[in-house]
């Protein structure tokens, strides 16, 4: 992964388990991304308003449809716009290794490993329209 191209991308990681959140942060920072962290929906909205992310990565407990609603809520209340991709980690409902697009720039994924997630994030960040 080219760290230089990632240095301007901010990824907001929403994860309720400290160890998992810290692990995701380390992996993303090693790839050169700037990372902001949140424990829950409220924390994520505040963080996104302070420093708008280029992508939101949500991995919190709950049924997949509930987590997707929360992720969209974060994007809406932080006034980020639909061009900010939302990626929801899902441990159920879809087959391992799959990625499902649901709605405008919202994806559910259950990666087999970090390399699959890394590839998805890089692709989505490259697809973001550049503001004029």
Q: Which ranges hold each PLM region?
A:
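Accessory recognition modules or surfaces
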Residues: 1-8, 23-24, 54-57
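Acidic, metal-coordinating helix/loop segments flanking the phosphotransfer/catalytic sites
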Residues: 37-55
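Alpha4 helix (beta4-alpha4-beta5 surface) of REC/receiver domains from two-component response regulators
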Residues: 68-69, 88-119, 123
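Short beta-strand/turn micro-motifs composed of small residues
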Residues: 15, 58, 88-92
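Conserved phosphotransfer microenvironments
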Residues: 58-75
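Two-component/phosphorelay signaling modules centered on CheY-like receiver
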Residues: 17-36
